[in-house]
Amino acid sequence: MIIKNMSFKVGQTMIICGVAKPDATNFAVNIGPDEQDITLHINVRFDAHGDENTVVCNSYEGGNWCGEVREGGFPFQQGESFKITIEFTPAEFLVTLSDGSTIHFANRMGAEKYSVTSFDGEARIQSIEIK
């Protein structure tokens, strides 16, 4: 699912609620300036890419993945609902997971607004709120 022209700006918070599929291996949330580049990639990995029960954040720019960040807990369960909160400050994205654990991820592209949000993988997104 791709959502275009939905502005996410510095000072705002995005709240994503969904349900991981019962047999999910992974799913991802992507925020960026366009469909090619991703300033914040949140990849929830139950069993994918050689990782188990890990959240990996990264960015994708100019056709290349950058350095991975692995912080926070893993409050996700296959077949269960989840909530991901993303606070957008000038310097970083503060990602808060359902259990209250946090991931600090730099705003590597430095923009004050991103307009494309997409979701990949094995989760059903129920709501997206920006406030």
Please provide the spans of the model-predicted regions:
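Carbohydrate-binding surfaces in secreted/extracellular proteins
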Residues: 16, 84-103
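Secretory/extracellular carbohydrate-interaction modules
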Residues: 1-58
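Short, surface-exposed secondary-structure junctions/capping segments
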Residues: 53-63, 119-124
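Short, aromatic/His-centered strand-loop micro-motif at the edge of beta-sheets
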Residues: 64-83
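Eukaryotic short linear interaction motifs
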Residues: 23-25, 36-39, 92-94, 102-105, ...
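Surface-exposed coil/turn segments at beta-strand junctions on protein surfaces, enriched
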Residues: 7-9, 77-79, 88, 110
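C-terminal helix/juxtamembrane-tail motif
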Residues: 1-2, 118-131
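Short, solvent-exposed beta-strand-to-loop segments that form ligand-recognition rims
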Residues: 99-114
